[in-house]
């Protein structure tokens, strides 16, 4: 196992919304960091994130901070964007955060082509993440019956046989691992 895809909800899904100083957000980020460390100890060196607000951005920032430490210097972060300009309706601070991540990651892949429907691009982006990974870490509530890109990504990873599939609950930050 050498690579991990990351998926998760956008801030509007979380009880704390965009408030990253909220204890729930801090706890979630801490648990994500702990899981990345465990994956690294198991040989994972490449991480794939999708470039969305929320979990994707937080994961990328956590991983870049880890990479600054000599113990994680061989860590590689890959940014996979659904289409060029997917961030055009974001606030400037969020767009700058994305540009910073893109400048510091190993590479950026843009999935969609001009004229392609955005929804199709998001689905193809999620498939790309899974297709390039050995395991998946998803911030996802499997008990809620909401339709989401994260849910689709988890189910696609199950069909593809990724293992482990690590689920971090978006409200409690509890961690569970789906069995094959």
Question: What is each of the regions a protein language model found here?
Answer:
Residues 1-179:
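Acidic/glycine-enriched connector segments
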